[in-house]
Amino acid sequence: QIASEKHILFVVDASQTAGVYPIDVQELEVDVLCFTGHKGLLGPQGTGGLYVREGVEIRPLLCGGSGVDTYNMHHPSQMPTALEAGTLNGHGIAGLGAAIDYLNRTGIDVIREKELHLMRRFYDGISQLPDVKVYGDFTAEERAPIVTFNLGDYDSSEVSDELNEVYGIATRPGAHCAPLMHEALGTVEQGAVRFSFSHYNTEEEVDTAIRAICELAEEE
């Protein structure tokens, strides 16, 4: 509402929510919404999408052949072709489509319930450990199934490397494409370690991760 009153485009980054929560762009009155395919949508890397409300004009970042209106010497202006220069990632899009079919068959509510259960199990297991600082509001009813934390003053990359090399646990360290948030948290230099839970994960795997953090905290 504020953006509309000030004639500002309302742009939503749904990278962490697409496939986790239902999104109604009409109800949210979104002008532009972007999402990646390889996170909650379970699709291949290198896929994603952009919703653009009718009437919103976007200048193409890239121009080139599209296989549409070939004899026109100018880049197509009609949507979505205007934003799809070059050969599309057909096999990636097919994989993303198959993943979305799977989500629809299984139900994102069912998937989200398990992911949040695993997330809370992990949070409960590490949040009270000394020298472990967890970021985020875990009392919120609606949140992504991720846990981001730091261990003492250790660089997040060192913690992530240790988890990978010693315990075989893959995590994401660093700034997570959110530099302004890390400025607000005061973690620009340290970054943070992020666990992202999938409904393919098990409680046993979560417990293994908790034990790993406990052991690293004891070494700290």
Which positions does each model-derived feature cover?
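Pyridoxal 5′-phosphate
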Residues: 1-220
